[in-house]
UniProtKB/Swiss-Prot annotation:
Keywords: DNA-binding. Belongs to the UPF0746 family. This is UPF0746 protein DDB_G0280809. The keyword Protein biosynthesis does not apply. Residues 392-413 have a biased composition (Low complexity). GO terms for molecular function: DNA binding. The lineage of its organism: Eukaryota, Amoebozoa, Evosea, Eumycetozoa, Dictyostelia. Residues 1-21 have a biased composition (Basic and acidic residues). Residues 1-26, 391-413 are annotated as: Disordered. Residues 42-76 form the SAP domain.
Amino acid sequence: MISNKRKEIDTINEHHEKNNDDSDGIDNGLLTYKKFKKDFESGSTNYRELQIIAKSLGLASNGKKQLVYNRIEGYFLSKKVKNNLTNNETNRQVEKKKEQQQPQPQEKQYILTFKDVEPVEIYFWKIFRNIVIFKHIFSNFKSKQYSYYDLIGCDEILLNGKSNSMEIIIDNIKSYNHQIIRNESNIIDIINKFKKNDEKTRSFYNLLFSRYSSTSTSPSTQLPSTIQFDGNIDIWIQRMIENVNYTALDQFIKFFKIDSEVIKKAIKIHIDPSFFGNTTYDKLKIYNYLKSINSIPTSHTLLSTISINFSTLLSFDNKFKKLIKSYKRLIESTNLQEQQEQLEKQGIIKIHPNKKYYEKLNQKILELNEIQTSQFTNYQLNSTIKKLLNHTTPTSTSTSTSTSTSTYTSTSTSTSTSLKTTNLTIISTESNYSSTNNNNNNINLKEIIKKYYKSIYLFIYFTINSANKTIFRKPLLYYLYFKKERVDKMYEHVIKKWNGSNFDHKLFFQRIFKDIKIEKNEKFELISNVLNNKYVKTFKLKDLHIFFEAVFSSNDIELIDYFLKILKQQQLNQTPETTTFPVIGSLISDYCHFIDKKEILDFYFQNYRDECLLFNDQNQTWKRIQLGLIEHYEYLTGSIGNRCNFDIFRWFDSSKFLDRLNRTIAKPLLYYFDFRGTINFNFNFIFKGLIDSNTEDSKENSIIHFLSNAQLKHPLYVSPILESSFNRYKSKMLTFIKFLFNNISKESIETKLKVINLKTDNKNFEEINSEIVLTTTLTTTTTTTTTTTTGTTATATNLLSAKKGEDVGFFIIGQTESFNFTVSIRILLVCLYRLDRVDDIIYLFDKLPEVLFNPDYFSIFTKEHCLYGISSSYYLELFINYFIENLNNNTINYLYNCLCIASKKGYTQIFKNIISSDHNSKYLLKIRTKSNQSSLFSSKLLNDIVVKSINSLNFELSNLLIDFIDFSEKDKNTLKMKIIKSK
């Protein structure tokens, strides 16, 4: 065997000599990489043969077998890469000669030859290379118009409002556009946002550190000198720790190769010792990391300051794997076992006040050390603890659920439900289910979860002062899940141990009635005891609401039925000494918003129709029924000939108003409109509030649906409606704006603006005097806007009943061909801008300067949400140039306002372009004096422009303006000092 290998090796060497050692040995007769790898994996190549091959290739032959193999494999792969590069170049030259020799075809077909290209990418390149299609598609992108990146910078709105915010920042950094990150505050927001520990985030931070450091290769004219990570190492360590960002801290330390002593010093100076003591899951991760690189000062030892936030670290809503990690991080971070051993050696443990906790904890740690995470299935690790302990996926208990005793062990129980049962044992396969617990290899999962919780609680009891033990009371859920007592006994413990607070009452009843699997008879007994005043000394009247809510929200028909029957019996036997309970009809109506399935509605309809208000004629209760059940509710109510009452002034949940209003319009035979006593003036105010609440949920189609099927008697005042949508935190309402201005031309707007009343004697001119009425014409497409109300989609046309034309006060039911709306000039221009109709704006500027640049209107256009305030740098510069070209006593104010906005937003390039123009810079950015009357602005006005850039922390722009504008030395020094104080 070895002799054969030698022959193959000799052949390799000869081949290498002939080919300048550039071959990878793939040809016939050679020891090829493929054959070499196959022989090794099959076990036919022994250690001695590997050494011979390595020596023949000039490689080291010492070390373990796998190490020698890796060297040889690396040799083959490096040869292959080199040959591929050489061969590719040779092949390209050969192909080029062939192409020159052959006649060129008239039309060349491009074919992708890569084998690993995704199918979608192939389509992309086909489109990319088709000039006609490419231009059509990319003409829809309005990056110059919006340019939200330079408009808002890297603040919390960008970070939290855009799912691709990291990619946006990366693109801007790579293109050396540092407008996206203007100051250290932006970077702190980034550190607070991007914490995921994956390759993408790690690469992002490495890019960030490389560009914002003293060694950066970024052009000096672009890099903001105020941001350099390596200039304040200790401060950035502090910020990353306090923002609990493990990924940023880890990459920061590695990138700048920070010594552990430097980290210790930074922590000692800038981090309070109690910071890590107030333990959270992520803080433990950072603490253990710093401990692993020997960077925790002795003053910050965790054990001496530790306290635990039970509500987050040990929540039963956490995944099982998080509980395991929390336990390990807590035990590892404190060196608990080492400290225990030291105490034991010193004999201190014998007199330790918490000795009993130490012994129990030590036993639990030994038991948990025997358990490996690999023993659990992925399903178990990624399930919540509550879900695993409840045996079933949290859901409402159905009427067919068996009332046999529920089990807390892994023994499978037979129920008549089809609910998904989780595996409660550790098993050797990946199955999520188990039907037996007799196998010795199976371990009860509930007991393991309990051990983890128990160990953490014992750890706390062992490490804290005995006087503070009452602070670390085990949470109520731990008691409910792990104590094997009857429900009535559990409730007594709630009263005694947890003082029976409202929160504990609510938690107890919700878990007992809805989540925890307990024998149904015990739940019945608890209901009976509460209603029979067994707990009268502890159960207060204010707790009744909590109790009723828990019963009705369970959506368990058996439970609700039993509750209502006992309550009815109590009311029949009621005496002055007993608790007075609400009548059944009121209770059902008050808690009907908890109904989440049709069966509950049917139950009330069949058994309590006459007692409750739910199905009465012209009732208001229907508004509380969940939208997903409203169609079934309508069917039940209509089946007995009753109608629902729609009273706009008694509506309490405006976020659901439009969906319900559209239903009433669609089914006027089932709903009765009660708009009596209202006046038309109030409708705009009411409708604005309803629109505001619906824009947050992006329900613009609901708004359009209503306006398409209700003939308004008076123009709709849209300015305040759209005003609220211009807030950066809200939806832009582009769909609604397109709907309004769909068929309104610039000529029709011009006509309306011409007749506007420009005369006013009011010095404090109000915007209400600058409004116009426009008419929207609805097309067939518009009037059939789809809306989703009950889970099924239908068009507005199909939803309408045959009964149309009903006058309901504010409007007349029925499809409308057009409607009028009132809009202010300021909002009009903003809407045109949003619709990318800037050419129309310029058209109106040219046609109606006396209207749009009227001095009385100037205050309107200094607001934040005006045309110039929302413009991107591209369009703001366009407006600035327009005012320069059309300069007069009116436009000069608008020009100055735009320059102030550009300064505040840090649009540095606008000012660079002005400076580069000798003509513009002389009268825009030079001080107007007696000797220089060609300049437009005084020293104070130009000073204010600079101050706005300083206040916005745009120091690059500030320095640019200070250096160029001819301020006095005193004014320059004052401005520079202001920059220093702002840093």
